Amino acid sequence: MLERTLSILKPDVVKRNIAGQVNSYIENSGLKIIIQKMCLLTRYQAEKFYEIHKSQVFFVPLINFMISGPVVVQVLEGENAISLYREIMGATDPKKANSGTIRGDFAENIDANCVHGSDSLENAIREIRFFFSEYELLSLYEC
């Protein structure tokens, strides 16, 4: 099934200037990057985006990391995009991620683990709408 999913290249990717390499993994998997933009999240935006994790011990460090520098937010499109992207991202903990995955090859630790990807269709819709307006998404097909 043709799906869209949200991808975030986290501050460690931007800081280390490896966004192009990460994008190669995405494109080589058959997924298309249909729109992307670089932004600097505010604390409020980061807390709102990750509010599902508010009660977790890692919430504050996650928020501090996500506002530490620019991120690249992307909409990916392809067959089974959600599960495919989660597969090429690799395990959340890079120590458990397979070689050949983004986290396995590039992540420094569980906190600076390079990427975020939607985990369900419902979350993909919510997360894409969080970063991209309807106008931005509709204008993809206009020249």
UniProtKB/Swiss-Prot annotation:
SMART domains: NDK. It holds the Pfam family NDK. The keyword Phosphoprotein applies. It is found in: Cytoplasm. Its main location: cytoplasm. It is an enzyme of class 2 (transferase). One of its GO terms (cellular component) is cytoplasm. Its cofactor is Mg(2+). Keywords: ATP-binding, Cytoplasm, Kinase, Magnesium, Metal-binding, Nucleotide metabolism, Nucleotide-binding, Phosphoprotein, Transferase. The active site is at 116 (pros-phosphohistidine intermediate). It catalyses: a 2'-deoxyribonucleoside 5'-diphosphate + ATP = a 2'-deoxyribonucleoside 5'-triphosphate + ADP; a ribonucleoside 5'-diphosphate + ATP = a ribonucleoside 5'-triphosphate + ADP. GO terms for molecular function: ATP binding; metal ion binding; nucleoside diphosphate kinase activity. InterPro entries: NDK-like_dom, NDK-like_dom_sf, Nucleoside_diP_kinase, Nucleoside_diP_kinase_AS. The keyword Cytoplasm applies. PROSITE patterns: NDPK (PS00469), NDPK_LIKE (PS51374). Its EC number is 2.7.4.6. PANTHER family: NUCLEOSIDE DIPHOSPHATE KINASE, NUCLEOSIDE DIPHOSPHATE KINASE DDB_G0292928-RELATED. Major role in the synthesis of nucleoside triphosphates other than ATP. The ATP gamma phosphate is transferred to the NDP beta phosphate via a ping-pong mechanism, using a phosphorylated active-site intermediate. Homotetramer. This is Nucleoside diphosphate kinase. It comes from Ehrlichia ruminantium (strain Welgevonden). The lineage of its organism: Bacteria, Pseudomonadati, Pseudomonadota, Alphaproteobacteria, Rickettsiales. The gene is ndk.
